[in-house]
Structure formats: structure tokens, C-alpha cells
Regions:
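Non-heme Fe(II) oxygenase catalytic core, chiefly the N-lobe of the double-stranded beta-helix
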Residues: 10-227, 232-261
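Short, small-residue-biased leader/transition segments that mark boundaries at the very start
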Residues: 1-12
Length: 261
């Protein structure tokens, strides 16, 4: 809208940041923004990622990931996840802008990891308080290698070299709000450190089932020109892939670190 032509003042940016910390996900409909504004808005929160190692980018803007799905390129994020937790320092936030939205389907779900933690039984909270878990690339490796040729093998190996896996505390404390939250996700969390495979699988299976309850979720129906920002530290999300063979095009900028942390 017209706000991009006059810029966003520091007071307004601070209010958006404070609301993000409180509500975890913010939605702004009918925002006719330019790619330049998208990048500058994301930069107001912290340093941004460029370019993404897998996905293509918007022409002239290597910082903006182009997420384009249709019958020839079906979606691959239709499972619960927190972005790239297989890295030692996962990103702080994502700023996603809708360009082309199918008439039916293509919603996105978010869930609050702090609300999930708060709802856990006290005995289970005590059990997991000091546990750590291994996060690896999981099915994300399919983005690197979707055939058997040598180029894909090289790309996959480079992905393992860059990301490998990471170990994170199962329970974390938000650096700004001080809320505790459950830091695992079905896509990338593979093993509880120090547990047998059987015990680890049983615990993770219980927690994953608990985390996916609709009571902790919000479901958002996209319209074109909608801007959404979420705190990747304490949320999971799920992009529903129910719109094939129709087309869905999104632009995403990833904020690596929290400028105010």
C-alpha cells in the first residue's frame, strides 16, 4: 500500500516487532509491495539470507526465494517443520509474500511451540527438561537429489557438508519473551541424545502426536498480495499441498538473526 512509498518509521517497525514476539505470526493483507520493499522490510528485523542453497530466486533479488509450485513442480513442504533446525543457528524469522494463490486450497498452518510446551503434563516437562535432540536434513535431502545423476550427488554431498546435522535442547527459552518452548519437529528431529533408538522413537512419537493437535494451530487462507512474518524460533508450520494442478507462487525472505537479541 502507500506505506511503502513513505517508508516505515522506527516506531511502527518496533510495534511490528513487539507484536511478532507476542503473537508469533503476523498477517498483513492487501499489501502491494515491491521486491525492494520486501527486502528492506525484512532487513529491519536482522541480517538476511542470500542466496538460498536450493531454491531459485526472484530475478534481480538473490535475497528473495521464489517458491513456485504447479503440476510440474509439486510442493515439498507439506509436513510440519520449523525451518532448517538441522543447522546450528536456524533462522530467526521468515517474511513470506503471496503472488499467485489458487482459488481453492493452499492454506498454511502454524502452531505455537510455547503453547504446546505449556500444555504438556508436569511429569513429562520434568523428563524432557535437560534432554537434547539430533536434527538432520530428513526429507529435505530430496531437494538436493531428485535423480541419480552425478550432479545431484555432488549437490547432495555439498548440502551435507554445509548443514550436516545439529544438536539442540529439547526445551528452549525464548531470548526475548523468556517463554519456554518445545524445540523439536517431525521433519528434522531424528533422535534423543543418550536414549536407545526404541526409547527415543517412542518419546518423539508421543511428542509429535501431541504437537500436531489442532488446539495449538492457526490456519490461514491466503489471498494475493498478503505479507506474513513469523518467529521461526518458537513455531512450526505446514504448507498444505492440496491445490494441484493449480499454481501457487510465493516470495520469501529469511531473516537469519534477531537484531534486538
Amino acid at each position: 500500500d502507500s506505506s511503502q512509498s513513505r517508508g516505515l518509521g522506527d516506531v511502527y517497525k518496533r510495534q511490528i516487532y513487539d507484536d511478532l514476539i507476542q503473537y508469533k505470526v503476523l498477517f498483513f493483507r492487501e499489501q502491494n509491495i515491491t521486491p525492494q520493499f520486501h527486502v528492506e522490510f525484512a532487513k529491519s528485523f536482522g541480517s538476511i539470507e542470500e542466496p538460498h542453497p536450493v531454491y531459485p530466486h526472484v530475478d534481480g533479488f538473490p535475497e528473495i526465494v521464489l517458491l513456485e509450485n504447479d503440476k510440474d513442480n509439486p510442493p515439498d513442504t507439506d509436513e510440519w517443520h520449523t525451518d532448517v533446525t538441522f543447522k546450528n543457528d536456524p533462522p530467526f524469522a521468515s517474511v513470506l509474500y503471496s503472488k499467485i494463490i489458487p482459488e481453492v486450497g493452499g492454506d498454511t498452518l502454524w502452531s505455537s511451540l510455547s503453547k504446546i510446551y505449556d500444555a504438556l503434563p508436569h511429569e513429562l516437562k520434568a523428563q524432557i527438561e535437560n534432554l537434547r535432540a539430533i536434527h538432520d536434513m530428513g526429507s529435505f535431502r530430496n531437494n538436493y537429489m531428485n535423480d541419480d545423476n552425478k550432479e545431484s550427488s555432488i549437490k547432495l554431498n555439498k548440502g551435507f557438508e554445509e548443514f550436516g546435522n545439529a544438536v539442540h535442547s529439547v526445551v528452549k527459552v525464548h531470548p526475548i519473551s523468556s517463554e519456554k518452548f518445545l524445540y523439536i519437529n517431525p521433519s528434522f528431529t531424528s533422535q534423543i541424545v543418550g536414549m536407545t533408538t526404541t526409547d527415543s522413537n517412542n518419546l518423539l512419537s508421543y511428542l509429535f502426536n501431541f504437537m500436531c493437535k489442532p488446539e495449538f494451530q492457526i490456519r490461514f487462507k491466503w489471498t494475493p498480495n498478503t505479507l506474513v512474518i513469523w518467529d521461526n524460533r518458537c513455531t512450526m508450520h505446514y504448507a498444505i499441498g492440496d491445490y494441484m494442478p493449480n499454481k501457487r507462487v510465493m516470495h520469501r525472505v529469511t531473516v537469519l538473526n534477531d537484531r534486538r537479541d
